[in-house]
Amino acid sequence: MKNKELNLHTLYTQHNRESWSGFGGHLSIAVSEEEAKAVEGLNDYLSVEEVETIYIPLVRLLHLHVKSAAERNKHVNVFLKHPHSAKIPFIIGIAGSVAVGKSTTARILQKLLSRLPDRPKVSLITTDGFLFPTAELKKKNMMSRKGFPESYDVKALLEFLNDLKSGKDSVKAPVYSHLTYDREEGVFEVVEQADIVIIEGINVLQSPTLEDDRENPRIFVSDFFDFSIYVDAEESRIFTWYLERFRLLRETAFQNPDSYFHKFKDLSDQEADEMAASIWESVNRPNLYENILPTKFRSDLILRKGDGHKVEEVLVRRV
């Protein structure tokens, strides 16, 4: 039987907003409206009500997993007679389409997790920094494939994750500028002795094909994750959010002379919409269906969004 014929929804328990909100229990983490807006992505939506209804229960669930992993590691280290083993961070992966709101989810989780009673140190890394530099992509004639799996320096990303899980004291990741549409040369995000590391990116749940495994057996990014989240929505909604974001960028970031897209600052509304639609159809939509959406059911939890970026349903994997 082909995977597409399987009803993979049965792997998950499904919860609407009302039932999910009840799983927050007695966990209380204060977040102001200003703080919620500060982590909100461009054209995204995050209110205190959304934090309390969706993210507090999620943080409680994540905390259970973090504590369970720490307890398991402690017992395994005793068994192996390594009582003073290096500190190993709990890694959370967050995947989903362009414009679906992954960054907002990642940032609010970082803030909330860091405010748990035991005050864990939480770092956030986006995989954008592991895109090959623009000059290299141009040299390989791959600019139209930017965001597709082959446009990432996967070897460097795997080395970064391997260093984290090996207990290395200090690990650094390259930083990406959405203004210049390129890596920031010589700029790095340093992760030092973190308790939790969040890895956010469109393709982080992708696995090698069977052909890849036969020819070159290897591990992939998701093999380093202790918990994974997929931010989901209907394509029509995601496209609408992408279109709205493109319009906002034209009015803001594109006006900056340093912006890679400065040449598009004077586009009319119709021209901007046509360009956004063209990019969506030629790049983002194919990437969604070829590489991102097929990984949804590899996640431990799915946040399904509806109108206005509000999460309508939460799916939690049973096994």
Swiss-Prot record:
GO terms for cellular component: cytoplasm. InterPro entries: P-loop_NTPase, PanK, PRK/URK. It is an enzyme of class 2 (transferase). Keywords: ATP-binding, Coenzyme A biosynthesis, Cytoplasm, Kinase, Nucleotide-binding, Transferase. It is found in: Cytoplasm. The keyword Protein biosynthesis does not apply. It catalyses: (R)-pantothenate + ATP = (R)-4'-phosphopantothenate + ADP + H(+). Pfam families: PRK (PF00485). Its EC number is 2.7.1.33. Pathway: Cofactor biosynthesis; coenzyme A biosynthesis; CoA from (R)-pantothenate: step 1/5. One of its GO terms (biological process) is coenzyme A biosynthetic process. SUPFAM superfamilies: P-loop containing nucleoside triphosphate hydrolases. Belongs to the prokaryotic pantothenate kinase family. This is Pantothenate kinase. It comes from Bacillus subtilis (strain 168).
